[in-house]
């Protein structure tokens, strides 16, 4: 069942993540327009931190994701919707599992992707 997008407003972006293991080899997608590194917490929780450079891209999801903007901004559109929604620093948006979303970036968009 499709859940409508949720936009969570918070007052502060995540600036630092402690006590993690970092995958040193970058994940490079879309000819370098998106670059990320995987991180793993002591409890096994996985996230990725990265940047999307100016472009319009489509990402597919396996697990549900929460995208947290830490710098820059983007507009996103979830699969099955027509509206572009802006996400700025300190904001998050949710993407269902086994779905996709379009992202439109005019300036470098720095993010944390929370899986599951």
Language model feature labels by segment:
Residues 2-44:
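A short, N-terminal "cap"/entry segment at the start of jelly-roll beta-barrel domains
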Residues 57, 72-77, 92:
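Short beta-strand segments in beta-sandwich/barrel cores
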Residues 60-62, 78-81:
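Short alpha-helix capping/helix-loop boundary micro-motifs
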Residues 41-62, 94-97:
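Conserved short histidine dyad/triad with adjacent acidic residue
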Residues 62-75:
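Short, conserved beta-strand element in jelly-roll/cupin
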Residues 96-116:
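Ligand-binding loop in jelly-roll beta-barrel domains
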Residues 31, 36, 49-53, 60, ...:
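Acidic, Ser/Thr/Pro
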Residues 81-98:
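Short acidic-glycine-tyrosine-enriched beta hairpin
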């Amino acid at each position: 069942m499709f859940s409508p997008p949720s936009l969570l407003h918070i007052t502060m972006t995540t600036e630092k993540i402690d006590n993690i293991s970092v995958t040193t080899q970058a994940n490079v997608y879309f000819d370098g327009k998106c670059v990320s590194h995987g991180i793993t917490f002591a409890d096994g929780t996985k996230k990725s931190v990265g940047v999307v450079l100016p472009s319009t891209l489509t990402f597919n999801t396996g697990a549900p994701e929460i995208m947290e903007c830490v710098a820059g901004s983007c507009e996103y559109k979830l699969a099955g919707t027509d509206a572009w929604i802006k996400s700025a620093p300190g904001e998050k948006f949710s993407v269902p599992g086994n779905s996709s979303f379009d992202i439109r970036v005019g300036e470098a968009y720095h993010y944390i992707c929370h899986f599951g």
